Amino acid sequence: MKTTICAAALALLLGTVCYGQKRMSQPAAASGASCESVYNVRDFGAKGDGKADDTKAIQSALDHAIDHGGGTVYFPNGRYRLATMQENYRVKAHLIVKPKKSPGKRDYVMIRLRGETCVVTPCSYANHTGEDRSEVWDNGTVLFSDVLGEPQTDPAATPACILAAGTGSNLYSLNQAVIRIEDLAFQAKAEEGKYPYLSGINMAYAATVYTDNVLIYSSVRNTALTAPSKDGHYSAGFIGPRLWCNPEQGLRNVYVKSAFRYGFVFSEHMNGNDLSAWDCENAFVFSKMDHSCWFGRIHAQNCKNILT
């Protein structure tokens, strides 16, 4: 009898506590992680219908997570249209992970961006089915840019991106957010025969970044984008944390497809496995670094330069 009463009391207590957790997602509760801070972007106004501009709603969810000690920003399956560019924290992007502010301290917060699914095919688009179009990847959680942007010809300028980590106010401009990206696809808008003007993901100022099952691609056919030699503007699929931030980084199952001028841009301390670049002029680019990187399987196809 006592055991039954105690179990019932515990269940009631947990239910009360977790009911008060702001914007708890149903998937989190169903999986047993009922007291984890999970913020569903639909609860902040995102539609995921491919029509509404979801930029403001998703940004609100990201800001809320940072302001409340971190947690998971959850994207249910759908196509999230991004039609507004933002400039803040010395970066330009549709979505910005703002820095954690702790005056006089150097502490960190973890934020996870997690989709429901991310469909990645083993080749460019779906050539094995006789099709060659970006829509074959729509059956997943896709954040797509509806802004063409402007050509960027200055390599020293800050790139315009779909997602970026904003700069912090400490010595190395470190964001102090540990960022995890899982089961998400990011699509940049492009013109036929040209690389996208926007870059994909810019984590140059992230404290640390971890990924699993992430796809970054453009809106046009891959066969029209096999390293166009006269397309001289700069864009990159994935930009890792910069020199002197001394972060620990882990990329797993990240695919840059069809196509950017640079597939991946790395500095030091990068750990990577199952990284794939398609149709980029430079597949894997290593910038200034004082320490080493470690990689397992990396793959490049239809790229002019594999290592730069």
Q: How would you describe each model-predicted region?
A:
Residues 155-168, 181:
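Surface-exposed, low-hydrophobicity beta-strand/loop segments enriched in small/polar/acidic residues
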Residues 21-60, 79:
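Right-handed parallel beta-helix/beta-solenoid
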Residues 45, 55, 59-135, 140-149, ...:
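N-terminal extracellular ligand-recognition/capping segment immediately after the signal peptide
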Residues 75, 82, 97, 115, ...:
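Extracellular beta-strand solenoids
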Residues 1-6:
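Bacterial N-terminal signal peptides that target proteins for export
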Residues 38, 70-72, 77-79, 88, ...:
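Detector for repetitive beta-architecture
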Residues 137, 168-279:
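Right-handed parallel beta-helix
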Residues 7-16:
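Bacterial N-terminal signal peptides
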